């Protein structure tokens, strides 16, 4: 008989200690108060319609499930529902395509606001034991959640089958046998942040809670394939491909898809189902409503959600995500090498079945165990979870407290029974009683597990570029602290905290390694008072005070940096730092900076961010907020700003803007119109400055700078003219432009985040500029642009021409590869015709493809500039924006040859 584990997960924790999870009770205002959760919605007990043909698959008949097991699972589901607060429309989803979905506020978001990738707090996950409440099940979404209707949804089965068919949800429920069983789902990236602390992978920071177990119900896949008459291997039926409804940016735009071998799909022992229920109810949107794959023992990445097509093929899936995701490449292969040498397409590196893994969950991170007469008289119980893949049973879990010299065998609890083929699809729980004095003398606690094939976990982490399948020993460090005056205690530290949350012993060790690798001159100064500040700890409230040009502090990966002395030297201008001053800008920093910039940042580190709730002489946090036993898990309530503002842009904040119009100007140029949050707002972008567009693309934050082409006083919207860099066009950039392709695939009604203003140049009208806070004046402007660099030049020209009293002359030299690449040509030519004395425009193209081209071909040369821009003078400024090689090899040297003082008279956007 299966045993419930909920009440045993934290039974030996010190009452009132930091991190202890108490029993949850329904909120007094909860709609579930007083209900007994019979789970009797329309799907709980399907009634087959009379006179309906049911295609039975006798060879894979369901096991004779023990009624006691079913009742126990039902009790767990009911208990979890009572303890979990209702899901709500999260304020963080406002302005995203997922704003219609209700979610649990305690989920830790790992990729910003959108898409929704999240895991529950580890302690809360373990509190619920064997069956995870659906709102707390980890979520892996590559993009917006598709909207689907139960009555309209169909799944198509096609390819190498005798009878291609489409099935409605009603047919799946009524015409096929169902299978219901608990299955543990695990993301292949579980524990990835540990790898990212060693060396950054291309994946985001999963903690140790990318694992959940629920009861799934659905149709056996093999029954569907048999009904459609799947062909034999000799006729080419080798792979089963799955395709979802979600349209994603990867590969220039594609649906999420993957495949498994036919042998897996048709194996009755594998219990593969097409699921439509989870914990007794219809699937929720985040978990694939109305239909998804469940492949027990496999990684989550093979279990396609929002399932629309099943294709029987000879080859594996051709989906971008089948090849560019869920691989474990050798440690020497980075992203660049993987792309250059096509490592993604080597079949030996694909991940299907999970590997053996285990985690310590008790003690939890930053838990404090006081050492006193009461605690030392009873043992402390270590606890955690373990799992393996392919249906293999976890047979042994061991704990060491001396670095692996000796191992203690733990008690292992398997709450599930194996299926009739002897396979285990769920996690198990382990525990070990230890003496408190032994904990006091230990420096760390480590765990490893073994499965029935005698596979075990490696001692050390093995890095790979995707950060997947990390299963090294899970280590918890111990340190002595003073929870109360006159007492000592043990504080426990897990290796990392999920997402961008700071904390964990790996972050501290990384800091020490960086300090040890510092140049000799830096090492020598460590003993000086200035360098001693690197060991100082700062609270978030202290950092927030340093948000101005007089003192600009930022937080990146838990480290505090004073960027004040770098403000004037920053290539992106002062605003690029000030817009993040006083905040944690880890995500933004990683999105736009190279490894070189990250190393440069170390020169400005002054200390670390305080992430713990204790100090050496302070008490642990034993408070309970109000009468709610689960308030500690609720997200902090943020005070909302007024709904209506005259200016949309808010420094240090991202604002959501909806795409309301998209026009094709040419085959690769689009004009996008984005609505501001309020109809009566203006964007609030000074002339000469730019904005960042932010989006999660291929699981990473992508930020790109754009200058609007609409005038600064447009009300309710702004416009961008964007050149789309498609993949496979430019050999140097085979994947094309990430953001431009993302925008091109963005549907009307979708949102992007906008941040700004940024930039160090501001045109204040009538020839007056403010550059790095210093004023400059010009009567004549030499305006040099390349490619999309025309947009800030165009913006300044717009402002000049809109003011009838602004008499500034503009001499534009605009370089492109071909005539077809010229942006805003009609507008520029129109101004030149209407105002020939004030606006002069000259084009330079590398290769002319049209007859009768009257402008220059080749590159910007000294001769071109001498003929088409004014000579240097006290009232002449040069403005330039374009690719770095153009500025370095064409603009700078040729202006100097003409006599320009490029340090004083050249403004580069």
Swiss-Prot record:
This is Nitrate reductase [NADH]. Residues 652-764 form the FAD-binding FR-type domain. Mo-molybdopterin binds at residue 187. It catalyses: nitrite + NAD(+) + H2O = nitrate + NADH + H(+). One of its GO terms (molecular function) is nitrate reductase (NADH) activity. Belongs to the nitrate reductase family. One of its GO terms (biological process) is sulfur compound metabolic process. Signal peptide: none annotated. Keywords: Disulfide bond, FAD, Flavoprotein, Heme, Iron, Metal-binding, Molybdenum, NAD, Nitrate assimilation, Oxidoreductase. FAD binds at residues 704-707, 721-726, 733, 738-740, 791. InterPro entries: Cbr1-like_FAD-bd_dom, Cyt_B5-like_heme/steroid-bd, Cyt_B5-like_heme/steroid_sf, Cyt_B5_heme-BS, FAD-bd_FR_type, Flavoprot_Pyr_Nucl_cyt_Rdtase, FNR_nucleotide-bd, Ig_E-set. Its cofactor is FAD; heme; Mo-molybdopterin. Regulated by the nitrogen source and controlled by the circadian rhythm. It holds the Pfam family Mo-co_dimer. Heme binds at residues 570, 593. Residues 535-610 form the Cytochrome b5 heme-binding domain. The lineage of its organism: Eukaryota, Viridiplantae, Streptophyta, Embryophyta, Tracheophyta. Coiled coil: none annotated. Nitrate reductase is a key enzyme involved in the first step of nitrate assimilation in plants, fungi and bacteria. Binds 1 FAD per subunit. Binds 1 heme group per subunit. SUPFAM superfamilies: Cytochrome b5-like heme/steroid binding domain (SSF55856), E set domains (SSF81296), Ferredoxin reductase-like, C-terminal NADP-linked domain (SSF52343), Oxidoreductase molybdopterin-binding domain (SSF56524), Riboflavin synthase domain-like (SSF63380). The keyword Iron applies. Its EC number is 1.7.1.1. Homodimer.
């Amino acid at each position: 008989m299966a045993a419930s584990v909920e009440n045993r997960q934290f039974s030996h924790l010190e009452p009132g200690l930091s991190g202890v999870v108490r029993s949850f009770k329904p909120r007094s205002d909860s709609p579930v108060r007083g209900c007994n959760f019979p789970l009797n919605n329309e799907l709980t007990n399907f009634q087959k319609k009379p006179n309906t043909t049911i295609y039975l698959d006798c060879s894979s008949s369901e096991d004779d499930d023990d009624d006691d097991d079913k009742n126990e699972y039902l009790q767990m589901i009911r208990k979890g529902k009572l303890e979990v607060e209702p899901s709500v429309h999260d304020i963080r989803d406002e302005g995203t395509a997922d704003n219609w979905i209700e979610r649990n506020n305690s989920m830790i978001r790992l990729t910003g606001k959108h898409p929704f990738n999240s895991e529950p707090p580890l302690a809360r996950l373990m509190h619920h034991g064997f069956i995870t409440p659906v709102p707390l099940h980890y979520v892996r979404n590559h993009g917006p959640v598709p909207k689907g209707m139960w009555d309209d949804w169909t799944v198509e089965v096609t390819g190498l089958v005798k009878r291609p068919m489409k099935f409605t949800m009603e047919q799946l429920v009524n015409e096929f046998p169902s299978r219901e069983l608990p299955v543990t789902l695990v993301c292949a990236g579980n524990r990835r942040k540990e790898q990212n602390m060693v060396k950054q992978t291309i994946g985001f920071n999963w903690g140790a809670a990318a694992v959940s177990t629920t009861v799934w119900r659905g149709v056996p896949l093999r029954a569907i394939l048999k009904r459609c008459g799947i062909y034999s291997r000799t006729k080419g039926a080798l792979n089963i491909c799955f395709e979802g409804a979600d349209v994603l940016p990867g590969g220039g735009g594609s649906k999420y898809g993957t495949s498994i071998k036919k042998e897996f799909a048709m194996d009755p022992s594998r219990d593969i189902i097409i699921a439509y229920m989870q914990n007794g109810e219809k699937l929720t949107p985040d978990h694939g409503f109305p239909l998804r794959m469940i492949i027990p023992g496999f990684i989550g990445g093979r279990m396609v959600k929002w399932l629309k097509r099943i294709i029987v093929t000879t080859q594996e899936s051709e989906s971008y995500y089948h090849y560019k995701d869920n691989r474990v490449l050798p440690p020497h292969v980075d992203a660049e090498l993987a792309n250059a040498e096509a490592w993604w397409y080597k079949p030996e590196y694909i991940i299907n079945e999970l590997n053996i893994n285990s985690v310590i969950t008790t003690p939890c991170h930053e838990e404090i165990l006081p050492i006193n007469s009461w605690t030392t008289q009873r043992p402390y119980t270590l606890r955690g979870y373990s799992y393996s893949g392919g249906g293999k049973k976890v047979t042994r879990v061991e704990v060491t407290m001396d670095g692996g010299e000796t191992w203690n065998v733990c008690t292992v609890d398997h709450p599930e029974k194996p299926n009739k083929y002897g396979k285990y699809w769920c996690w198990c729980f382990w525990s070990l009683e230890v003496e408190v004095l032994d904990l006091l003398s230990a420096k760390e606690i480590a765990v490893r597990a073994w499965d029935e094939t005698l596979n075990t976990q490696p001692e050390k982490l093995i890095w790979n570029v995707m950060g997947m399948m990390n299963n090294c020993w899970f280590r918890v460090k111990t340190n002595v602290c003073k929870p109360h005056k006159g007492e000592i205690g043990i504080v426990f530290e897990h290796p990392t905290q999920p997402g961008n949350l700071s904390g964990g012993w790996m972050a501290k060790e990384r800091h020490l390694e960086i300090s040890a690798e510092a140049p000799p001159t830096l090492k020598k100064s460590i003993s000086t008072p200035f360098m001693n500040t690197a060991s100082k700890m700062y609270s978030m409230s202290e950092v927030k005070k340093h948000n101005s040009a007089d003192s600009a502090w930022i937080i990146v990966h838990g480290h505090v940096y004073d960027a004040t002395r770098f403000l004037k030297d920053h290539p992106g201008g002062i605003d690029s730092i000030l817009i993040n001053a006083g905040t944690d800008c880890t995500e933004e920093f990683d999105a736009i900076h190279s490894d070189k910039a990250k190393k440069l940042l170390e020169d400005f580190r002054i200390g670390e961010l305080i992430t713990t709730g204790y100090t050496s002489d302070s008490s642990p946090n034993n408070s309970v907020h109000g009468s709610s036993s689960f308030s500690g898990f609720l997200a902090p309530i943020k005070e909302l700003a007024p709904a209506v503002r005259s200016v949309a842009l808010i420094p240090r904040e991202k604002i959501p803007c909806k795409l309301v119009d998209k026009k094709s100007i040419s085959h690769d140029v689009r004009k996008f119109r984005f609505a501001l949050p309020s109809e009566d707002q203006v964007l609030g972008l000074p002339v000469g400055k730019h904005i960042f567009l932010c989006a999660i693309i291929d699981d990473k934050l992508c930020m790109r700078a754009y200058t609007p082409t609409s005038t600064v006083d447009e009300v309710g919207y702004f416009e961008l003219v964007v050149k789309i860099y498609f993949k496979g066009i430019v050999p140097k950039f085979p994947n094309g432009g990430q953001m431009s392709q993302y925008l091109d695939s963005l549907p009307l009604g979708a949102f992007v985040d906008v941040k700004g203003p940024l930039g160090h140049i501001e045109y204040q009208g009538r020839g007056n500029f403010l550059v790095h806070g210093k004023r400059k004046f010009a009567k004549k402007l030499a305006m040099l642009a390349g490619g999309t660099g025309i947009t800030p030049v165009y913006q300044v020209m717009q402002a000049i021409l809109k003011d009838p009293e602004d008499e500034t002359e503009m001499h534009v030299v605009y370089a492109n590869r071909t005539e077809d690449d010229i942006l805003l040509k009609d507008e520029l030519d129109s101004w030149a015709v209407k105002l020939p004395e004030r606006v002069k425009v000259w084009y330079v193209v590398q290769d002319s493809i049209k007859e009768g081209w009257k402008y220059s071909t080749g590159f910007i040369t000294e001769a071109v500039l001498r003929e088409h821009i004014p000579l240097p003078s006290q009232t002449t400024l040069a403005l330039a924006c374009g690719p770095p090689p153009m500025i370095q090899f064409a603009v700078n040297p040729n202006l100097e040859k003409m006599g320009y003082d490029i340090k004083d008279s050249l403004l580069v956007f």
